[in-house]
């Protein structure tokens, strides 16, 4: 049983820092060499490093860097279900957008390798997650359900050829082994500037880099033009209904979450993705995604791997903040430095060259007067309730449907 403690009344109410900053929600970082942060090393696959910090309420921002592409600053918020300001997409949006973009990349690569001309292509992806148990008793657990992928395709070949095209594309995507295998996440923990042992989670045996909180505060971010991300439909806060206002802060829960994305490719090659949050009740956003030069794109927007990596970091951090809020404990600042790796299989090979994904490695930084034991509980419960760490640790299958158009 976890003991609750009331937060002192003097603690400031959350404020919409993303709106107040005046910065674009997403933007490419200009002059990345000025950042006091170490970029991921080049190697097999696409290594992605995320530095993220909490802002106010459920708002977070991150700098995400791939060894192959541009450095991006991304931001996330939550809707009325977590008493957020709804100023930016929710964490789960980033993973769904990255996944559907990755599937689109793989499908186009396989079609190109086989010299198949596609007239029309739209992907519709559905991600569902579960949350059950009590936060106060330490039994609340996040889960991930099989991914649904509908391929709407116009192409002048037979059904067998289309089916093989889609199956091969799914196989060579980095998501193939992310979903089919169990990946155990590893963590380190720094509390108030001092590294301490973790609790139940697996230990990350590597030196923790500098606290992202300090790194963010050391420079004013130089930016290029912000990548357009627009809200297509704003949610209306509703109380007393499933998925409505404040419902995700209840201490006992049994619910299913549903995120959908529709992905199309523009004439310039950039992918345009409409992300919908059906449960809990959330807003609809439009994302853009593009791969790096030399990887099939021009780097005009964040790539698939960057979105997926940012989603994991943002979702885990939401669980840290949510857990502290439910328990009424003080957690004024928190951040992560996270490493992930994704590798796409060979689209032109007749051999089995499945895409691969590495485990998530996360250095966690907490500033709290509650002590190291509470900090360890936060990390344990953060991993236990994080939907996207559940996605990594749960073997799943992609449920594919094909619609000829």
Q: Which role fits each region the language model picked out?
A:
Residues 2-97, 109-310, 321-405:
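Extended beta-strand/beta-hairpin segments
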Residues 99-103, 315-316:
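Alpha-helical metal-binding/catalytic segments enriched in His/Glu/Asp
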